[in-house]
């Protein structure tokens, strides 16, 4: 159970590329993030990443009208049919080409994909089990260039497709007699979006140069006639239909022409252009990049390359308002079902914004790190994660909601290290700009800035257990600087290393600082002995990372030769080592001239972290794998693959030999480069950053790893973002001291006999959460103390761990608080003797209770202030203010408190009762 971690959420990245979608209720946004999809619940303020991944970056997402199914298509043309209800993959399909967009029909029976210069219509998967969920119905030809956008009529009879050849094509979903296809021109640039009017065949088309054309149809939707068969064609058609019913997979091809024949024009549907509007006025050349149209309110939203968006009312083209929301191009726009919220995605900076246009306020405003993340740290209670990136920003994330609630931008260069103090309210960061800064999470400000006498670049930072001493290692001067948190003064400069400082770590229990350097040494510094070198540990290679065990009795060091060595800091003796070269499994980059096997000799672990109990260690580095080792046995317990995204570099061990030519690798030729801003050439020798090009494949790597203090999850900063892996107790069956006589039936039989202690013990041995919940909730509140006193000490820890996990999902707050209080009061002394092993469980319990305390305290304070205000207003109603005050302010406050207690009906006891009821 300890190693059964699974991917649970993706933080740090909110949008990459692709189209945004609102769910049917309009309260959630579905955003593609790399090769994953994240759902942002705007009503409950929570984000959740689906537990699935595509082989390449997601390019487009199509949502069914009922909101239960989604089709996710990646850059390689592979599609996943996903159930949003059970969050699982139902079907895999390959479209054999790059797909630009996908759209379901309003009735949910069919969907259309634009692939190359054609549009293909498929039968949507039904509710019954099918061998092939995607059955091709028709293929539509006509455009000469790539098709870009799709829109359906409300009755699902027709759909319109826009193309890069500046034409718009209207196709019939059925065999209509008066409408097979219709080509519309009128534009001088590629079509970005096209939309039908509500319950009409009238449509709007928008091009990239900022031109809107309004087209009127002379036929209503009810005027479409099915094409009747005649003569021998009817017999042939009937025979073909019978064959289609037998085979079930035959498709129809419809080929359109830009200039139809004269006999095809008679009695057909005709379009005429009513108006033509221009967004760019007076020579303002601003490319239109995205658009969305709400049919019920006739609201048109357009996004431009400069980060500006316009709101217009159609068909009058009245400008409602215009606003600049970003410095980068707007890549995607979506409107929810009610038409109140508008979602914008900016792929340049990775921004996701939800704007309420009527109140002109933000519902959601999130942005990830522009460049890769470098460091992360958990708060002591495990509720928050702080990350630092190469863009110089420091972000604090809430692990429960998945949102970033504060961003610090004081650093002017890349952040190299972040850490929390023991209180959890101060974040200390180091940067390449030569400063170490301390941030206050109460007031969200930078209250301390530590600098060195001479400008230097800091590569790492550490804070002692008391939070009074701050130390940072220099990359260029090979020195360690020590400051006081209270005064901000420089206390000492520690010299002795002959290479850049790669890592610092304080002993959690003693005043000892460990420093790792590229000079193949590890030094221990004594804080109370004038910062003298206590020990110098000689290593076999350059040190890259260092960490202490939570109890401070062991030290782990990662070196450049892919080894992890363990040391006893008291006696300066090596206690063990792990050879991790074969566990990294590095891949071959597309620019590598050597194989992955030879390239692995230069790869190593760059980050280490002990688990909460200290029995295992987490290691990651220049690879797509994260390894968990057992410290005592020195063996690999499990290896986690952090990504399967082939859009990243160094993912595969062998390159495709068919792409290897005498001029180099054909995969390096970017097909999408040069479409908007021309061909961008990467700078030579650049290993990280934006590479001077927006079209490059970043290399997969793990830059930082941290275990949660609760021991239930661990986080990793990677090229994909901030990944969180946690224990999923709902799927796994992990019994504890199981016997053949213990069954769920025996547990329920003991509950019927009111033998609660035996029922709880058997349920804990089965270790099924629902059965344990049933056994605990069957105990009357008056007998909780009797049952807890008869529980063996071994099972108290199991009950506390279950209570901690139940606080997050259960509504029985007072009942579980009674269980927690009785267990800690009756077994507190015995549990204290095993404080080291029980620390993760206690921290997990504290985190869950603290979250409820924060939520309820805000609610109760709000209600209390409202009642005080209502009482004050009721006293002043109908009376004039007198010149002389009736009494002192203290008497007035006391009278208000008395009135409030009378209203509550019993003072503090009643308030506690109200808390328990809520």
UniProtKB/Swiss-Prot annotation:
Repeat (WD) residue spans along the chain: 12-50, 53-93, 94-132, 142-181, 186-225, 283-322, 325-365, 368-407, 410-449, 453-495, 496-535, 538-577, 600-639, 697-737
Pfam families reported in the protein's UniProt record: Utp12 (PF04003), WD40 (PF00400)
Annotated positions of the Phosphoserine modification: 895, 899
Domain of life of the organism encoding this protein: Eukaryota
Main location: nucleus
InterPro entries to which the protein is assigned, alphabetical: PWP2, Quinoprotein_ADH-like_sf, SSU_processome_Utp12, WD40/YVTN_repeat-like_dom_sf, WD40_rpt
GO cellular component assignments: Pwp2p-containing subcomplex of 90S preribosome; small-subunit processome
UniProt feature, compositional bias: Acidic residues: 887-897
UniProt keyword Nucleus, yes or no: yes
Biased composition (Basic and acidic residues): 250-262
UniProt keyword list: Nucleus, Phosphoprotein, Repeat, WD repeat
Subcellular localization: Nucleus, Nucleolus
PANTHER family, per database record: PERIODIC TRYPTOPHAN PROTEIN 2 HOMOLOG, WD40 REPEAT PROTEIN
Subunit composition and interactions: Part of the small subunit (SSU) processome, composed of more than 70 proteins and the RNA chaperone small nucleolar RNA (snoRNA) U3.
Family, similarity comment: Belongs to the WD repeat PWP2 family.
Descriptive protein name: Periodic tryptophan protein 2 homolog
